[in-house]
A protein has these predicted regions:
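Glycine/small-residue-rich loop that forms an oxyanion/phosphate-binding "nest" at active or ligand-binding sites
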Residues: 1-12
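Glycine-rich, flexible loop/turn motifs
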Residues: 2, 103, 164
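Catalytic cores of large soluble enzymes that bind and process phosphate-bearing ligands
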Residues: 6, 75, 169
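Conserved acidic, metal-coordinating active-site core of Asp-based
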Residues: 11-13, 17, 21-135, 139
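Mg2+-dependent phosphoryl-transfer enzymes with acidic/Ser/Thr/Gly-rich catalytic loops
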Residues: 106-188
């Protein structure tokens, strides 16, 4: 398995910057668990547990004995792009913010994204990125849509995904991925 973690000093620098933004809710994602502070709204913690099955509530992020893989932020949806831009400027050289949609922002390591993961998988399977199809709707899909041979935007995709994609399909509520795969297979 391919795992890339933040250097602890870099992670601490990122945390220091993130903790200055009052309009966000922060979750630290580790290899063993995800972590939120005891001061996090209990309703948000309940929601987070739907997505992070191993979630620890901690007094301080300083006490985490785990490899930090990414930071997940929730913010008001209407503030997402503004916060992404603020983070992009303040985290230069440390991390890259990317919107995963609906007021969610991931803070990831530079160069470690879905396209990099597909490249690694392709290398193992001897499949070039240009032979792959990928589907996406959020900013965290952008590099992947750009790098594969056929990038497909979902109907609900963010505008930058739609302008980057080679093709389009309906949303996941109407089986958009399945319909597109069926179409590809029928054309062969």
């Amino acid at each position: 398995m391919f795992v890339n973690k933040f250097d602890r000093i870099v992670a601490d620098q990122i945390l220091a910057k993130l903790e200055t933004i009052s309009t966000i809710s922060l979750l630290v994602c580790g290899r063993l668990s995800a972590y939120v502070l005891t001061t996090t709204n209990p309703e948000q913690v309940r929601t987070m547990r739907n997505y992070y099955h191993h979630l620890e509530v901690v007094k301080s992020y300083d006490n985490i004995d785990d490899d930090i893989l990414k930071f997940a932020i929730s913010c008001p949806p209407e503030k997402t792009e503004e916060i992404v831009e603020v983070l992009r400027r303040s985290l230069v050289g440390l991390a890259e913010p990317t919107s995963s949609g609906h007021g969610d922002i991931d803070i990831i390591q530079p160069g470690i994204n879905k396209a990099a993961g597909l490249k690694k998988l392709g290398d193992l399977l001897e499949i070039d990125l240009k032979q792959m199809v990928a589907f996406g709707d959020g900013g965290n899909d952008l590099e992947m849509i750009r790098e594969v041979g056929l990038g497909v935007a979902m109907a609900n995709a963010q505008p930058k995904i739609k302008t980057t994609a080679n093709a389009f399909t309906s949303d996941n509520e109407t089986q958009g991925v399945l319909k597109f795969i069926d179409k590809i297979l029928l054309e062969q």
